[in-house]
Amino acid sequence: MLKTIKSWILGKRDQETSHLTSHRPSTSLNSYSAPTPKRTRQTAMKSTQGTRDSARQSTNLNPKQQKQAKKIVDQLTKIDSLGHHTNVPQRQRIEMLIRRLYREEIGEEAAQIVELRLWSLEESPEAAQILTMEPKSRKVLITMKLERWIRTLLRGKCDNLKMFQSRYQEVMPFLQQNKMETVMMEEAWNLSVHLIQDIPA
């Protein structure tokens, strides 16, 4: 049963991700430019097949299971829903930064900085929980949190530093209650503020 739900969730997420990215034009950030590897294309084809298989499997779930699976899908795609921007060039720059965060050394460095800062936090159960995770899983979780904060700070039409700072003010009450998330937000700020500063006046 769990395997069926998991397959349905992954298929649904692949389908939504494909919808978000299918019409996105190619772009570049600094000198980064990576062609799509053959292996990636093969993976995409397998993912499409998996989506069709998952759709068939979802019919075997009872209403309660489907409701539970949909709730999990909504949680998994919450990050994607934060990424809708009215400024298309800005959105392209954000997506390129996030791809670099997952694929290049910038992501490794950011995760290491966050990890070191988490070690310095005292009496933070949230930080302690992350630090007890297996290193690979910890890095993935930190990267996902950084992505979420980048999308939160740059959501909507945020094309100048003043608007960027107003986003920060909006989340201040939450950050005052969670030191771990404050560390994540500050690193996301450092990673993404140049996207605002680089926009021509």
Swiss-Prot record:
InterPro entries assigned to the protein according to its UniProt record, in alphabetical order: Paramyxo_C (IPR002608)
Region (Disordered): 15-70
UniProt xrefs under Pfam families: Paramyxo_C
GO biological process: symbiont-mediated suppression of host innate immune response; symbiont-mediated suppression of host JAK-STAT cascade via inhibition of STAT1 activity; symbiont-mediated suppression of host JAK-STAT cascade via inhibition of STAT2 activity; symbiont-mediated suppression of host type I interferon-mediated signaling pathway
Superkingdom of the organism of origin: Viruses
Keyword field: Host-virus interaction, Inhibition of host innate immune response by virus, Inhibition of host interferon signaling pathway by virus, Inhibition of host STAT1 by virus, Inhibition of host STAT2 by virus, Interferon antiviral system evasion, Viral immunoevasion
Ranges of compositional bias, category Polar residues: 18-34, 42-66
Keyword Transmembrane helix assigned: no
Similarity annotation: Belongs to the respirovirus protein C family.
Name used for this protein in its record: Protein C
Source organism per UniProt: Bovine parainfluenza 3 virus
Taxonomic lineage from the root: Viruses, Riboviria, Orthornavirae, Negarnaviricota, Haploviricotina
